[in-house]
Amino acid sequence: LALVGCGASGSSGSASSAAKKDYTQILHDARSDEDNEYEMIFTKGEDGKFTAQYGYSAEYEADQLSDEVANMMMPLLGLEDDMYDDFAASVSGMMVRVYGVAIVKPAEGKTQDVVDALDAYVQSQQKSMEHYLEDQYQIASAARVATVPTGEVVMVCCEDSDTVFENIKKALAA
C-alpha cells in the first residue's frame, strides 16, 4: 500500500500508512552545500547497520562507518535502538563546532524519550561552548527541538537554524 498525494489533508492516518520518507534527502536539501560537503548524514540501514552519505562518509569502509556511528554519534545524541522507528542525523565530532541536525520518527510511546535525548544533546552543546567559543554558543542557544505536525521529532542545532528547521518541516509535510 503506497499513498501518494498533493495538497493539504488532515493527518488522521497513522504515520505507518504513509510512504516512507527519505530523511537523509530531506536533511541534505534543508542544509547548506558546505554542510553537505563536510558533515555526513547517517541512518540505520535495512540490515540494522548504520550507513551514511555525504561529508567524509566515503572515507570509511562499511563496517568501520557503522561502528563509528554506533560508538560515537548515537551516544552523543542519546538515541537508543528502541526509541525510534527511523531517523537520519548529522553531528559534528569536532569540539570547536556546534553542529547537529536530526529527524527522528519515534517508536510508539517514545516521543518524549526522543525529545528528552535531543534536548540533552543541545544542552550539552550549550554548556560546552558557554565559556569557550562565543559564536558557537550563540548557535547552540538558537537550537530547536520540536515535534512537527507529521509526528517526527526534529532537532536543528546549526547556523541559520530557523531556516533549516522550516525547510525540514516543509519537506516532511509534503
List PLM regions with ranges.
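C-terminal motif of bacterial Sec signal peptides marking the signal peptidase cleavage site
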Residues: A2-G5
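Bacterial signal peptide processing site
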Residues: G7-G10
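Early exported N-terminus immediately downstream of N-terminal targeting peptides
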Residues: A18-M74
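Extracytoplasmic/secreted envelope proteins and their assembly/folding machinery
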Residues: K20, T24-L27, V101, T111, ...
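Sec-exported extracytoplasmic/periplasmic mature domains
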Residues: R31-D35, G109, D119, Q123, ...
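Short, compositionally biased low-complexity segments enriched in polar/charged residues
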Residues: K49-Y99, D113-V114, S141-A143
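A short, solvent-exposed beta-edge/loop patch
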Residues: G93-M94, I103-K105, Q136-A174
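Short Gly/Thr-rich strand-loop-strand
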Residues: T111-P149
